[in-house]
């Protein structure tokens, strides 16, 4: 049964979409260098078998071929399990998970195309779906992942399948007294606090885990042990027992994975206090991988705006310098225009004076010719003197 479960939850069927796969070692084989299903088929020939499509009953030799067939023929969208939104492509899903939920890695279920923010949640999801079909597939020679009962994905609250195994985990008597006395690798996972508990059977793989299930949620440092105890004792979740699965009601409208991530933050905070006491004084940080994408975009826009402002200031300074030079040139031109106007006025006066003198000379010449004194030398000399005096425009100094 263990070997069959390994085939059901092989890396080919739990390949993460959008981001590179982590280095995983299952059954002693490294599959970190594989891309899609072809590399795994070459390195793991034991995964070859009969994979039947539960919708059209076609049989495929490899699980990757079955997954590709499901996505191309039957399922045209991916589902975000955080906000329960249907998305058309894996690239759009990756962008949505990073921008809307600040999740940099996602893990896909090849059966229903749901995107999980944590690999442990994907394993719980697949294990729960597989346990519901073990009784129906014991005598079937076909590998059962292709015929998983898809009714588990028709539940109104799909996260009941994830929380059901967690409700039966042991709770320590006192979080304050038990955490410092135990080594890091042996700290148990605290169960969700509820007044009524159901009694489902805990899966063997979950009970034998050597350490808490890892999570991609940011780890926050607790301020004090009393604060941790108050947060653990706070009754945030109420459960009630039903014949099929436990129904969970939340106080707020937050998603189910948000509640699980907040519970794991309480588990992670004592580990930091035990390993390094000095880290409690530092402020809570978020990994650079989980930086806000909107912050990067806003910072880039601010830098572009600052560069534009500097360029505009430089242009304004240049235009002010040019305006000062233009004002100086205008002042010089105004002085030149005034000087030219004065010269024109002086030339106009000289022209008028010359015209008057010319008219006087003409009158004197006409009078001299009318008197018939041209033969008298003395009269001629006096006439010439008068004519010369009239032609002088300015008086000598």
UniProtKB/Swiss-Prot annotation:
UniProt GO BP: positive regulation of transcription by RNA polymerase II
UniProt GO molecular function: DNA-binding transcription factor activity, RNA polymerase II-specific; transcription cis-regulatory region binding; zinc ion binding
UniProt keywords, alphabetically: DNA-binding, Metal-binding, Nucleus, Repeat, Zinc, Zinc-finger
Zinc finger (C2H2-type) boundaries: 51-74, 78-102, 107-125
One GO CC term, this protein: nucleus
PANTHER family noted in UniProt: C2H2-TYPE DOMAIN-CONTAINING PROTEIN (PTHR19818:SF163), ZINC FINGER PROTEIN ZIC AND GLI (PTHR19818)
Record protein name field: Zinc finger transcription factor family protein 30
Organism: Caenorhabditis elegans
């Amino acid at each position: 049964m263990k070997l069959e479960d390994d085939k059901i939850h092989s890396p080919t069927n739990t390949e993460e979409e959008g981001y590179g796969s982590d280095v995983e070692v299952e059954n002693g084989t490294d599959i970190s260098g594989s891309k899609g299903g072809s590399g795994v088929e070459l390195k793991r020939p034991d995964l070859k078998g009969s994979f039947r499509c539960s919708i059209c009953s076609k049989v495929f030799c490899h699980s990757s071929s079955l997954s590709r067939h499901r996505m191309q023929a039957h399922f045209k969208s991916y589902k975000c399990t955080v906000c329960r939104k249907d998305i058309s492509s894996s690239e759009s899903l990756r962008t949505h998970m990073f921008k809307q939920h600040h999740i940099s890695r996602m893990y896909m279920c090849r059966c229903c195309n749901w995107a999980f923010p944590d690999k442990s949640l994907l394993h719980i999801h697949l294990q729960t779906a597989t346990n519901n079909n073990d009784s129906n597939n014991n005598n079937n020679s076909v590998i059962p992942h292709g015929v998983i009962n898809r009714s588990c994905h028709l539940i109104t609250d799909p996260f009941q399948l994830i929380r059901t195994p967690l409700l039966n985990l042991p709770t320590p008597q006192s979080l304050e007294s038990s955490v410092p006395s135990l080594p890091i690798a042996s700290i148990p996972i605290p169960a969700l606090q509820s007044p009524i508990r159901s009694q489902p059977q805990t899966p063997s793989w979950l009970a034998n885990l050597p350490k808490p299930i890892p999570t991609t949620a940011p780890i926050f440092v607790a301020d004090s042990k009393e604060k941790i105890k108050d947060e653990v004792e706070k009754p945030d979740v109420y459960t009630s027992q039903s014949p099929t699965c436990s129904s969970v009601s939340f106080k707020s409208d937050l998603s189910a994975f948000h509640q699980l991530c907040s519970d794991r933050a309480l588990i992670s905070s004592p580990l930091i206090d035990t390993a390094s006491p000095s880290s409690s004084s530092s402020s809570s940080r978020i990994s650079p991988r989980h930086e806000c994408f909107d912050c990067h975009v806003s910072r880039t826009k601010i830098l572009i705006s600052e560069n534009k402002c500097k360029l505009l200031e430089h242009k304004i300074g240049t235009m002010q310098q040019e305006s000062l030079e233009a004002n100086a040139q205008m002042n010089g031109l105004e002085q030149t225009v005034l000087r030219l106007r004065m010269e024109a006025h002086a030339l106009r006066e000289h022209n008028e004076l010359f015209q008057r003198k010319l008219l006087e000379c003409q009158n004197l010449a006409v009078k001299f010719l009318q008197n018939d004194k041209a033969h008298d030398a003395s009269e001629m000399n006096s006439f010439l003197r008068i004519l010369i005096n009239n032609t002088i425009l300015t008086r000598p100094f």
